[in-house]
């Protein structure tokens, strides 16, 4: 099995007619994802390489039965795009867009929880999600992901998501689903959300978790691992040498006031029983040992 998306998931791309939306929408379709529609208010009635374009998400759902969306809308329009998708009945939204104001993120995070509890948002500012061999929604390179399980991956970092997939592929270890939750301060889907889903998935036997400096998400995940995970977890935390007060790539990747350090996160994870690597390759080697003992 996989979590959140599989070969039956039908996806509408909000922003399919833009350069990035078109590029990745077609790439995802070529991977095997059911990319059934795009939206663009000014280009309704046209198509992108055979994919029909509709004026809005509601029209796309009515025509195609889409249940998921992928957002490639410029940052100022993301708030409206998220609520449009949720209001139309989309149950899984992947938002790739970077630079969404934190105020907007907090607003639609709470709006979804209050008014659309049946809708899950992944992102913003994330690489997306891939269930290898089944579906790829976002910007992850499908050729580095080996299908077949038994490992689930969840990561805050985009590039380290790819590195984790590559490390496992090199060791001939398959992945059920790889989720990039994004590095912004207010992610729609958390480490804990993914850990809980992997724990419930019968085909996922172990989990690799990639964290980074800033915030307390990894410490909270460690508490969940300690209290609720029966499956082994390996981890890597990026930013061991990051100077305090300097943002490292993501809006959420900053050590402030002595909090959010890599050392503190690694200690919390070790205390929870997770195996912690000092670099991505070591994290992959730790997972290889875990898989060998399954």
Segments (PLM) and residue ranges:
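Catalytic-core regions of core metabolic enzymes
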Residues: 1-294
């Amino acid at each position: 099995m996989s979590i959140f998306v599989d070969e039956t998931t039908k996806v509408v791309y909000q922003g399919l007619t833009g350069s990035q939306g078109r590029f990745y929408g077609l790439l995802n379709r070529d991977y095997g994802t059911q990319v059934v529609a795009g939206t663009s208010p000014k280009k309704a009635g046209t198509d992108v390489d055979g994919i029909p374009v509709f004026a809005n998400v509601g029209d796309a759902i009515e025509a195609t039965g889409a249940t998921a969306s992928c957002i490639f809308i410029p940052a100022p329009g993301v708030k409206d795009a998220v609520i449009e998708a949720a209001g139309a009945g989309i149950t899984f939204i992947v938002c790739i867009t970077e630079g969404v104001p934190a105020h907007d993120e907090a607003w639609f995070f709470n709006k979804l929880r209050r008014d659309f509890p049946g809708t899950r948002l992944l992102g913003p500012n994330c690489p997306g999600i891939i269930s290898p061999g089944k579906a790829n929604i976002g910007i992850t390179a499908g050729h580095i992901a080996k299908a077949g399980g038994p490992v689930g991956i969840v990561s805050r970092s985009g590039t380290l998501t790819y590195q984790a997939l590559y490390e496992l592929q090199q060791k001939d270890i398959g992945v059920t689903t790889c989720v990039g939750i994004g590095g912004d301060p207010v992610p729609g889907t958390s480490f804990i959300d993914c850990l809980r889903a992997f724990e419930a998935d019968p085909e996922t036997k172990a989990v690799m978790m990639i964290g980074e400096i800033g915030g307390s998400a990894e410490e909270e995940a460690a508490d969940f691992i300690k209290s609720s995970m029966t499956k082994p977890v390996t981890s890597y935390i990026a930013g061991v040498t990051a100077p305090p007060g300097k943002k490292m790539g993501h809006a959420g990747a900053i050590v402030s006031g002595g909090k959010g350090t890599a050392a503190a996160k690694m200690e919390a994870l070790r205390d929870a029983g997770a195996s912690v690597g000092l670099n991505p390759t070591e994290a992959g080697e730790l997972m290889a040992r875990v898989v060998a003992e399954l």
